[in-house]
Regions:
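His/Asp/Glu-rich metal-coordinating catalytic cores
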Residues: 18, 22, 42, 48, ...
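Acidic/glycine-enriched edge-of-secondary-structure segments
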Residues: 21-29, 116-122, 231-248
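Structural beta-sheet core signal
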Residues: 5, 51, 83, 145, ...
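Conserved residues at the C-terminal ends of beta-strands
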Residues: 52, 176, 270
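Accessory, non-catalytic peripheral segments of nucleic-acid enzymes
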Residues: 218-277
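Domain-start "cap" segments at the beginnings of catalytic or binding domains
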Residues: 1-22, 209, 215-236
Length: 277
């Protein structure tokens, strides 16, 4: 059994650029990322997609962003989408019922697929300190837990204290909130991972973006990061010390940077140059 873990799509987020058409093109690419994800799942016989929070960028998403999301849900009835709301889309609700859209609340809820249990909870003021003690998992099953928040050494709103989840029979903790892939160990049994976002939206979200692919074979679970972004946002420093004219600086940049025509770049010129150059 294979499962996709994604998060932080942030459909409808503001993307600014000096040229409006470029901004709109990038917004469309971010919006299209969820459709590409669902298509990938369908073509690769993956029937469960985890969405660990912040599908939308706000509690009141634009109609075109809601339509994009829910149309994909309808388009792929063979895929179960497990949608856990995050801190950006806490109030998002949909009046229509889609059998393949599975949601969560502020109490633990479990969806089972054979011996694989997927358990999730949406963090809020009423459960931010108590949810650790109320988590109960079957030790004989493969347990995937979904949460949206930031790992912390303390408990509190939108915080997840990893040490409080040790020895809870978690095999994989599917997290959202951090926009780059990050993973680590919970205890001898389980691991956690932030999938990161599907598409970088600015120069604070550089590098490869994508999702985590889980592979479950009998009683063993493995996972790997799967790059999936349409474009990579890159920020690169080029040392131009001692260069005293524009042509030589351009030549240095072209020598040191391997440009991909699809990617987005910010080149920072660093170093010491003569004052009169």
């Amino acid at each position: 059994m294979k499962i996709i873990h994604a998060a932080d799509l942030h459909l409808g987020s503001k993307i600014e650029a000096k040229l409006k058409d470029i901004s709109e093109e990038r917004k469309a690419e971010v919006r299209n990322s969820f459709l590409r994800l669902a298509k990938y799942a369908h073509e690769n016989d993956i029937h469960v997609v985890l969405l660990s929070g912040d599908v939308f960028d706000s509690d009141r998403p634009f109609k075109k962003d809601k339509d994009t999301f829910y149309n994909v849900i309808k388009q792929y009835p063979d895929i179960d989408f497990l949608y856990l709301r995050g801190n950006h889309d806490t109030e998002e609700k949909n009046e229509d019922v889609y059998p393949n859209l599975k949601t969560f609340s502020e109490e633990w809820r479990t969806y089972s697929y054979g011996n694989v249990d997927i358990t999730g909870l949406e963090l809020g003021p009423n459960n931010s300190t108590s949810f650790y003690s109320t988590l109960s998992l079957n030790p004989e099953h493969i347990n995937i837990v979904m949460l949206h928040g930031t790992l912390s050494d303390s408990v509190g709103l939108e915080k997840i204290k990893l040490s409080n989840l040790k020895n809870k029979n978690i095999d994989y903790l599917a997290l959202g909130d951090i926009h780059s892939f990050e993973d680590g160990e919970i205890d001898k049994r389980g691991h956690y991972a932030y999938s990161g976002c599907l598409e970088g939206r600015g120069f604070d979200e550089t590098g490869e973006k994508g999702f985590v692919l889980l592979d479950i074979n009998e009683d063993k679970l493995s996972y790997s990061f799967h790059p999936f972004c349409e474009r990579i946002i890159r920020e690169i420093n080029v040392d131009v010390s001692s260069l005293n004219n524009i042509p030589s600086i351009i030549a240095k940049v072209e020598k040191e940077v391997s440009f991909n025509s699809k990617d987005i770049y910010r080149i920072n010129l660093i170093g010491d140059v003569p004052f009169d150059s």
